[in-house]
Regions:
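Short helix-coil boundary/hinge micro-motifs
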Residues: 1-137
Length: 137
């Protein structure tokens, strides 16, 4: 099991909850500027957010998955804000969050927590985002 808490790559604490979701959805601007537009741009952003360790990177396919996750999250949030349901967006977000491979762990004292069962860096990024979604909603 992997602790869902990503290691901060800098002195900044990892983003959590609403702050993480707000920051992730704000990575693309109305004018088309995209802070995650390329893998080379996404990796430093993930590190600054405390989601990706300094010694880790993401593959091209993981970068594409990250963009799909971000876009699905933006679509779900837009639907929630308008009070309308968007089954397609929620299905896309659910599929994207599955990459986090979350499991529930229980401590000897009986406290439950979420953790990623994956060892891959990208899965831990997704796990942190999935936990933020669960905590925020």
């Amino acid at each position: 099991m992997t602790d869902h808490s990503p290691a901060a790559a800098s002195d900044n604490a990892p983003l959590r909850g609403h702050a993480l979701l707000d920051s992730l959805t704000a990575t693309v601007a109305a004018d088309g500027t995209d802070l995650l537009g390329t893998r080379e741009e996404a990796v430093p952003w993930l590190r600054r957010a405390g989601l990706l360790p300094d010694d880790a990177a993401i593959s091209n396919s993981e970068h594409g998955a990250l963009l799909r996750l971000r876009d699905a999250l933006r679509d779900v949030l837009a639907a929630r804000a308008s009070g309308a349901a968007d089954p397609d967006a929620t299905a896309r977000l659910t599929r994207a969050l599955a990459d986090g491979r979350l499991v529930v762990t229980v401590s000897p004292a009986g406290a439950a927590a979420l953790a990623s069962s994956a060892r891959a860096s990208y899965s831990n990024v997704v796990a942190a985002i999935a936990i933020a979604v669960a905590q925020a909603w």
